[in-house]
Each structure stands twice: as structure tokens, then as C-alpha cells.
Amino acid sequence: MAKFVFVTGGVVSSIGKGIVAASLGRLLKSKGYSVSILKLDPYLNVDPGTMSPFQHGEVFVTEDGAETDLDLGHYERFTDTAMSRLNSVTTGSIYQAVINKERRGDYDGRTVQVIPHITREIRERIKRVANNSGADVVISEIGGTVGDIESLPFLEAIREFKGDVKRNDVVYVHVTLLPYIGTSGEIKTKPTQHSVKELRSIGIQPDILVCRSDRPINDGLKNKIGGFCGVNSDAVIASLDADSIYSVPLALKDEGLCKEVLDCLDLNDHESDLKDWERLVHKLRNPGPSVKVALVGKYVQLNDAYLSVVEALRHACISHDASLDLHWINAENIESEGAEKLLQGMDAIVVPGGFGNRGVNGKIAAIRWAREQRVPFLGLCLGMQCAVIEWARNIAGLEDASSAELNPNSKHPVIHLLPEQQDVVDLGGTMRLGVYPCRLQANTTGQSLYNEEVVYERHRHRYEFNNSYRTLLMESGYVISGTSPDGRLVELIELKNHPFFIACQYHPEFLSRPGKPHPLFGGLIQAAQMRVPSSPSEAFNPQSKIIEKKSLEQQ
């Protein structure tokens, strides 16, 4: 039977619960335990799929097509374990399920209430993850902050949960903040005490406290916190600000977080195997020459909107002994200031996904610059669609070429709506979502990078390459290097006689891992290194073993 860990947060939002949960998952896995992690989000949206990137940040897509919180990306990257739609729970999805049951008459005419019906549904979702995944340990991160009214049903549900299992089958971890007051030169514990008091008022006594701080916490302070909060001082874990999120698992290991969790759950504390992770962090802290990568997007004001893209670039740089020098470029600024001014000197250009008209012409201008100046380029989702439009306009002679999404009146809609999307009205959860196969063409850069005939990638889009223009674009020099197995959908395009020019309709960033960078990102960084004078990289060769998919153990 599975064991359960609940991670809550206090004092402030964005305190790092997701990284703590992901780090704990990594530590447990290093000791031989299988792990699944779920996020319980207290907003009324059924999922974040229709939320603005400025509001929510990135929407992470799972293999089975769920649109989820970006924390699931952290969970997958840290544990190298695929999550599913069951691992993402929102207040909206809970209420939707309960109301649907009420409409079907499942409650036999009873009055439907937050307690017990909503809280029972939450508990059932957590147990469903345990049953579906078969994990030894299920970690649940409760979104929001203790004291928020939105989080109360979830906190009540996890309080009730301890009545469903044996005492040593559940542990409560509370992440809190220890602020430093510069004028007095002191770390203050009072906010943590009040946060724990608030949690206790709900009926939850935390077993472990993870205390965020920007400076070391001495034993005297740990004893004080433990005494006031009813926690053993050994279970007061310091979590100092780190140079990288990938350093956090090692820091929490040294603080004894995993040992305390295993003790509470009555699990054996096996010898841990973190050599690969330690090697990863060492390479991250000791990089080679930097590569300048321009990320040309429309949501660059909030970096979290492209979180997985940035992490995929970072993974590739770690693998290739490079330092990532990332330049955030607003696509709209390219429209007003020009590509040359903003992109001159870049070693690589990435144009990620997005929706709507705003900034598209700037993205197209950036792609033209990359093509004409022979700068390594990678386009993702909308980035591929913009690359097709750029080629159609400037090489294939279709001056009016556009996407049906961007210009419904275009005479040459080289990108059009997927046939199965024609009659779709609702926005939420109705796109082409999740994993689909892609057959790669032999003797192409794409096939050489993957070193596979068929690959499986995650999608999130409604629009697709218009096959009416396939012959024209191919005759003008475009290379279609990947399609759906039936050949109907164009998934991957590239250019010959260019250092590196590849664009895909899918989202490869969702499959990149710290120890296993995605081949497309690996190829981009290796090509970018060729533009760095002091780079040790050899001439770019897509068949090079450097860019094959491999783990750090093989390096």
C-alpha cells in the first residue's frame, strides 16, 4: 500500500512548495522508492488551459493530454517519471465532478455539501493516483497559502485523510519563510509560528518544517522553532536560497529531509544513489563558454510562461558544457525596432509557441533573420507555423501567405485549422493534446538527431500545415522531415544548406530532462557553439554522439 506525503505552504505564496515536492521525489527515488506527485490547485478553473500565460505561466501538457500547472513539469524533470491527468486537480474539476454526480442522482437525494462531498472527492482523487501509478509514495502539493479561504476544502480533505490510513502512512510537510530583518540583524521566526498555528487550527500538526531563508539557520534557531511549533528540532529543515533549482535536492538531502520523511512513514532508509545528480550540478556550476540564445516570444514579461523551454535549453547546455546566456526578446519590439538591432550577435534563436496575432510579424522577422544570417534556429508549435509562413512569403512567392488563425481572409492560408477542429466551439481541453507519433524521413537532420524512425511527442495546437501547399513549398526547397505515420500531418520541417534550421509542430521541451536533454535542443546548442570562438565543440554533425539521447551515466 502506498504512503502519502502532503506538502503545504505558509506565510507567502510562491515559497517553493513545488520544488520541495519535486526534490523530495528525487531523493525518494534515489533510495529505490517509486514516486508519483500531484498538484491540488485551489482555483475554480477546471484546468489552466484557457488561462492567460501572464496569469498562470506555462501550461504543461502530460502524455495523456491534460493541460496542467507548470509544477508538473518540475515533478517530471526531477523524478524522470511521466505524470498523467490524474496528477492535476483543481477546485473547478472537483466541483464539476461532484455536480455531475448530483445531476445523475448518485447522492440519492441528499444535500450536497463541501463536507463531506467535496472533501471526499478530493481524497478519492489522491487515492486514485496511488492506485493508478502503483507508486510506493504519493506526494501531494497543496496550492496556495495556509489561511487562504480557497485552500480550506483541500486542507480539510488532507486532515480527514489521516483517518483513512494508518498513522505511519501519512506525513505532513509544511514549507514556511524565515524573513531576515536587516535593521535588527535577526532572522524572525514569528511568521512561521503563526503559520503553524493557523495549520493547527484546521486540525493539522505538521511533522516536518521546511524553512526557507536567505542565510544559514543555526541549531539554536531550529530548537526555538521546533519548541514553539511542536516539531522535533531534527525535523526543522533549512532550505537556503540556491544557485539553481537543481541544487535543492542535494541541499535538502544534507539537511536530512528524506531521512525524516522515511522515519515518519516507517520506511527503510536505503543507501541513496545521487551520483548522476551530483555530476549534473557540478557541470552546471562549472560550465564552458557561454552561448547567446535569443528567445523571441510574446509573453516574455513573465519568464514562467516559457519555463520548460528555458529548462530544455539549460539541459542541453549542461550536456554540452556550455553556459546559457539567455536573451528575452519581445516579438513586438522586433516589429518596431527591427530584427538586426535586437538579434545581432546571437548564437541561436528560439521561437516558442503561443496563440493569437500579437507579435507574430516580429516572430516571422526573427525567423527570416535566422534563415538569411545562417543563425541556428529552433521553432516550436507556433514557431513552426511562423517559419512556414516566412518561407511561403519570401521564398515560395506567396506574398499573402498567412495562417487561418491570424488572417481568415488570406488568399494563401498555408496554416489552417485541423479538420477535426472545424466544429469545435469550447476552448478548454479541445485542442490536439497529448502524445502522438511522428515518422521521421531518412537522411534528414531531424532523423539523425533522434536516431529513431518513429518518435512520440506532446502536442497542444488547433492549426496545422496546409497540405494544399506541400508540393509548392517542397519544390522551392523546404524539407518536410517528419509527419504523422499516415503522412497526413506535417510535424517537423528543416532547411538544407543551413547550420541548423529546424521547426516542429509539437512541444519537445516537455520531454527534456536534466540528464537527458531533448535531441532538438541538443542539436541547437551544439550548432550555436560553433559560433563561439572559444567553444571546444567540433563542427556540427547531426550524427555526432554528443547529441544522441543519452543519460549522464553514459557520459
From Swiss-Prot:
The entry's keywords: ATP-binding, Glutamine amidotransferase, Ligase, Magnesium, Metal-binding, Nucleotide-binding, Pyrimidine biosynthesis
Region (Amidoligase domain): 1-267
The Glutamine amidotransferase type-1 domain, residue ranges: 292-534
Binding positions (L-glutamine): G354, L382, G383, M384, Q385, E405, R462
Active site: C381, H507, E509
Catalysed reaction equations from the record: UTP + L-glutamine + ATP + H2O = CTP + L-glutamate + ADP + phosphate + 2 H(+); L-glutamine + H2O = L-glutamate + NH4(+); UTP + NH4(+) + ATP = CTP + ADP + phosphate + 2 H(+)
Superkingdom of origin organism: Bacteria
Coiled-coil residue windows: none
Biochemical pathway: Pyrimidine metabolism; CTP biosynthesis via de novo pathway; CTP from UDP: step 2/2
Task performed by this protein: Catalyzes the ATP-dependent amination of UTP to CTP with either L-glutamine or ammonia as the source of nitrogen. Regulates intracellular CTP levels through interactions with the four ribonucleotide triphosphates.
Name of the featured protein: CTP synthase
Species for this entry: Prochlorococcus marinus (strain NATL2A)
Organism classification: Bacteria, Bacillati, Cyanobacteriota, Cyanophyceae, Synechococcales
